[in-house]
Amino acid sequence: FTDFKAVGHSNGGLVLTGLLESGFLEKKKLTVSKLVIIGSPYQFNQEMYDDFQTWKHRLGKEVEVLNFVGSFAGKSDGIVPLSSAQAAQSIFEKQAYTEVNLKGRKAHHSALPTNPDLVKQLSLFLNL
């Protein structure tokens, strides 16, 4: 295979973003066509966030990004502040980017991957 779709929850979204910006995939002639990030804390560490901003020009314009953020406890999913999860938008500003804000009890950080609304939208986005 030369093309794949990727899903990352929490720090997994950060790892995938770092991978996409690293240049490694291009060297291996691999592309990511769709990226799903779920409750990822992009502003967890300022140095890391600054690095994402520095290297975002390496992100392929062909990747479509779907970002799920949770509002469980007001301005967070109980773990990740809403503003930190939404900071992905400034990193993926040249990509097709969609953000979905999930609310309520099933929008808690650890419950996000099994949230029925998320699973349905993720399945449609990935053509599963």
Could you say what each language-model-derived stretch is?
Residues 58-128:
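C-terminal catalytic-base region of ester-bond hydrolases, centering on the histidine
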